[in-house]
Amino acid sequence: ETYGYIRENVQATFPDRQIGLNTSADFSKVVISSSSDKFPGALHYYDVMEGAIIEVADFAPWLKEYELGDMIPFNFTARDGVELTGYITLPPTYRKGQKIPFIVHPHGGPNAKDSFGYRPEVQIYATRGYGVLQVNYRGSVGFGLEKMKLANKQWSLAMHDDLLDALSLSLIHI
């Protein structure tokens, strides 16, 4: 109950950020980490009894003067019916219907995955006018054993088809 109360208060303070909490044993003191797709992160100290949240460290204060691209999560169905996920980051100057070059930015692995959050290389591309596509193709971790098995012997085959399918679908819908 106490943890839930703390989490609600912190999330209300940082509504557009992902948060992590580390609490003292009695829940009176909290270290907060916060980040987003356009914000690499900060650490805050929260004295629950006083209700005060104080920023301790901003990991990249120099970025505040720049407009960065939005990361948009999406789901899609690959050509063989497999349900997959990905992210598109668009340039901050992008307007609906505008034609832009795209970079397909696959994660390593296959024992890895892309997730929502700040990625410096993605923002570098986006701020230079590129759309960036990140795909959790079959075999990406965190999606269950069955999805992992679908990647067996599929390097340069179905795994690459997943990337191409995601690119085709995202170009239609942006």
Which residue stretches match the model-derived regions?
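Short, non-transmembrane alpha-helical segments in secretory-pathway proteins
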Residues: 2-15
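Serine-hydrolase catalytic core recognition
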Residues: 8, 17-173
